[in-house]
Amino acid sequence: MTGKTSILIVDDVPENLRLLSAMLEQTGHRVRPAISARLALMAARREPPSLILLDIRMPEMDGLEMCRQLKADEALREIPVIFISALNDTEDKIKAFEAGGLDYITKPFQEREVLARVGTHLKLHHHQN
């Protein structure tokens, strides 16, 4: 399954995109970075990814709104979304789950945790489809 999976990473901080991309590419995933939610939605519609790693606080459109739009789209609603954010308040996490996220990782993150969560959700999604 790895190597064939495409992970869309959405974060407005270029350094976060570089770090997450390098981490996931090392494990054989094809990574597609997006600097904004608007660009990420266009990329997802053009070529639906296997999984989305999504920041919350971004200009233009935040990650919660992007997730709501994904879940409202018949063609994209089944894509697993993992939020990855510096917001660590319980209410922020609940809002992310209510928007349609399946998991939530707080920044600063640990590489092994990100890889474990991504791997688990890809396996679950693969078995459900």
Predicted regions and their residues:
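Two-component/phosphorelay signaling modules centered on CheY-like receiver
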Residues: 2-6, 13-32, 38, 42, ...
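Receiver (REC) domain active-site loop signature in two-component systems and cognate sites
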Residues: 58, 96
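C-terminal output helix
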Residues: 109-122
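The feature encodes the CheY-like receiver
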Residues: 59, 77, 89, 107
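Active-site beta3 strand of CheY-like receiver
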Residues: 47-53
